[in-house]
Amino acid sequence: MKKAFLIVTALLGLSLAAVAQPKAVGLRGGLFGNEFNGEISYEHWFSIFDNDYDFLEAELGVFGGNGFKGTLIYNVTLVHPEFTDRGDWGLYIGPGVVTGYGTGVNNKDELKSFAFFGLAAQLGMEYTFWFPLQVSVDFRPSFMIPAWMNRSELGKNANRWCHFAFGVRYAF
């Protein structure tokens, strides 16, 4: 009985803590090379190691009009400067994973479909206004492993794996 009570109490406490954490949902995108990449973005902040500004970022999106991808990144806020009296600034960095499916041209100029997975990193800056709006700019290099590419073919598709983006989110 004590174990059941402790488990229920712990689960209730975790659910209340999850509800109390700040979140943001919106769009992230940019023009990379001659291709547009756009994503639906969700951020969930939480506290680990006494840092209240860590957040998990999950995104689903399209790239180049011929593929889709999903990204999950754990961001740690490096600095949280007080530049202004209102609003919050943050400079963050984090590792993550990415997976997806698309088409691309190999070194024989053949159009191929491919699935990919890989590791990503992110360095960015965001500003959350005193009203529920957040804007961000970030740089995200990714190391992808497409199923059909060999090492010489990675260069032709490099603009898909390293890019800058701008984000606009509703913070709640």
Could you describe each region identified by the protein language model?
Residues Q21-K23, N34-G38, N66-G70, W89, ...:
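Residues that define the transmembrane beta-barrel architecture of outer-membrane proteins
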Residues K23-A24, N106-N107, N150-R151:
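Extracytoplasmic loops and strand-loop junctions of Gram-negative outer membrane beta-barrel proteins
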Residues H44-L133:
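Gram-negative (and chloroplast) outer-membrane scaffold detector with strong preference
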Residues V19-G70, R169-F172:
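Short glycine/proline- and aromatic-enriched beta-strand/turn motifs that initiate or cap beta-hairpins
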Residues W130-F172:
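Predominantly the C-terminal beta-signal and adjacent terminal strand-loop region
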Residues G33, Y101-T103, F143-A147:
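Feature marks short, surface-exposed loop/turn motifs that line or immediately flank catalytic pockets
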Residues V8, E39, D50, M149-E153:
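Primarily recognizes Gram-negative and organellar outer-membrane beta-barrels
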Residues M1-P22:
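Cleavable N-terminal export/targeting peptides
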